[in-house]
Amino acid sequence: MNYTECIENARPCLGKYCKACPECNGRACKNQMPGPGSKGIGDTAIRNYDKWKQIRVNMDTIAENKPVDTSLTLFGRTFKYPVFAGPVGAVQLHYGDCLDDVTYNDILVSACAKNGIAAFTGDGTDPNVMVAATKAIKNADGAGIPTVKPWNIETIREKMELVHESGAFAVAMDIDAAGLPFLKNLEPPAGSKTVSELCDIIQMAGTPFIVKGIMTVKGALKAKEAGASAIIVSNHGGRVLDQCPATAEVLESIVKALEGSGIKILVDGGIRSGTDVFKALALGADGVLIARPFVTAVYGGKADGVRAYIDKIGTELEDTMKMCGVSSLDEITRDCVMTF
């Protein structure tokens, strides 16, 4: 199976919102929520996609002809590509009831681990979602990253116990999920965290902690102050705040602000090809997350669909590196791309 076949297979399985488009650019689903769309006028996911396409790569084939190494080492683990499957929750609501969160995470975590990368898993109001996700990660020898919502502190403590039992090599919190309605309405309240609160949570985690949802230099410096091991430059695919800038627009300034800090920087939002991955690394990211296309991969081909999508992205990255005269991720520098 290739990814094109996977898309075709996914269409009958997905609900009425996601169209399993050949190019997942946010246009067909736009402001559909429930569904995979963006909040408000619905242009943030589209902007994410478009801004990567406005960056061009600089070809240079006067270079040593040697094998390309696409591997990334993060927190002591080495991965085949600098690509991670992003966390997705409530798949029945947004993508159709052929799969539930438990089954989705189980397929995704296992397939990603078998094909050399790792998956971030989603969270939800149903406690069984995190229970099953961390079990899948444990079965994959810790090769997964549970993503905990910014619940109240007692709920976070319960989730962290599951994380510890899973042996996950890192844990994340999508701090920007504070913009999701179901979190706002909880009692006791969930949502935004202060630097002090985040510091306490990071100490509780006791494992490399990734803060997802950073879109400003100020936010990045707060995550650094709290003790984060990594951040993810992300606007939650436009699903939590209307009319955000694209992640590609803010990435470089955040990279410069954290220079020399040792904090790893990942980025998501509209990255849809191995060439886009190359662009993100050229702007200073250590790795990327891709979310929505992995949903199509799982719905359209289960584990084989995930394998097909990873192969597609990896092959494209390798080809771009070769044609730009670089043989390792460290050699991908700012002069490898052109911005306008």
What are these regions (language model features)?
Residues 1-27, 219, 238-261, 272, ...:
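Conserved active-site-proximal phosphate/metal-binding subdomains
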Residues 2-80:
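An N-cap/entry alpha-helix motif that binds or orients negatively charged groups
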Residues 44-130:
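N-terminal functional module of multi-domain proteins
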Residues 49-59, 112, 116, 164-167, ...:
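Structural signal for hydrophobic packing residues in well-ordered secondary-structure cores
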Residues 88-100, 145-154, 207-215, 272:
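Active-site mouth loops of central-metabolism enzymes
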Residues 95, 121-122, 144-151, 183-189:
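Flexible, glycine/proline-enriched loop segments at strand-loop-helix junctions
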Residues 109-110, 138-139, 151-267, 274-297, ...:
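Alpha/beta enzyme core
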Residues 118, 129-155:
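Long, hydrophobic, well-ordered secondary-structure blocks that form the structural core
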